[in-house]
Amino acid sequence: MNLNVEKILIIGLGMIGSSIALASKSKGIKVYGFDKSNNSIKEALEKNIIDSKVESILDINSKDFVKKVDLIIVAVPPKQTLDVLNDLKDIWNTDVTITDTSSVKNHIKLNGASNIILSHPIAGSDQSGISAANGDLFKNKKNVLCDPFNSKKGHFEKVDNFWKNALQMRTSSMSVTEHDLIFAMTSHLPHLVSYALIDSIRLSNHDVDDNAGGGLKEFLRLSGSNSEMWRDIFMLNRVD
C-alpha cells in the first residue's frame, strides 16, 4: 500500500472540510469534493477550494472512483458521520483509506471495516460554513486518532502521515472510550455551560452589555459555534 496521499475526497464542505481542502491544495494534493448542498459545491469550485466535484455517494462507491483517490475524509456533523460511513460500505476493505473529523466517537460502530481510521482534528472556530474556510486552521494543532476496527496494516500510517505532512498537525492515539471521556471534560462541557449561561441571560431580560467582562465574552464566543454540530455532540456523548 502506498502511504503517500496525493489525491483526496472530502465529504462535507463546511468550515472544517473546506479548511482541510485549502490546506491540502497548498501542499499540491488534488482535492475532490462532495456535499449535499449544490450551493456549497458551486461556491467551493468558484473559490478554488476544491479541484473537482463528485455528483453522488453512488459515484464514490464505484470501483473506478476508488482508484482515483488515496484518502476519503468525512467532514460532516457527528450524527451524520455514522450514516455516511455506512453509505460507503461498498468500498470498505479496499486500499482507499477512510477517516472522519467527528469530535465524538462512541456512536461509530462498524463491523468489518478494515480501512477506516477515526480522526479528531482539534481545531475549530465560532464561525461555520464554507465562507469560514481557513487553510491555516490546523497548523500546529493536535489530532487524536482512534483505531477501534483493527485496521489493515498501512491505513493508520497513511492517515497519520496525511495529518502531519499535509496539515502540519501533531498526532496522538487513544481508545474511543478514553477520547470521549477526555473531550467531554475539556471541550464538550465548557460549550454546554456556555449555551446554558447565555440562554439564562437572554431569559432574564436584563441588559448586561455594559457590565460584561472578558469571561462572559469568551462564553459568548463559544455559544456562537455551529448549533447543529454541538447538539449532536451533546446527545451522542452523554450517559443516560
Pin down the residues of each PLM region.
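NAD(P)+-binding Rossmann beta1-loop-alpha1 motif at the extreme N-terminus of oxidoreductases
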Residues: 1-64
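Residues at the starts of beta-strands that form the adenosine-phosphate
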Residues: 7, 30, 115, 142, ...
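Short beta->alpha hinge that forms the Motif I/post-I loop of the SAM-binding pocket
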Residues: 36-37, 76-77, 101
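An anion/phosphate-binding loop that grips the pyrophosphate of nucleotide cofactors and donors
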Residues: 69
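N-terminal Rossmann-like NAD(P) cofactor-binding module of classical short-chain dehydrogenase/reductase
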Residues: 72-73, 99
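Internal alpha-helical scaffold of NAD(P)-dependent oxidoreductase catalytic cores
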Residues: 135-222
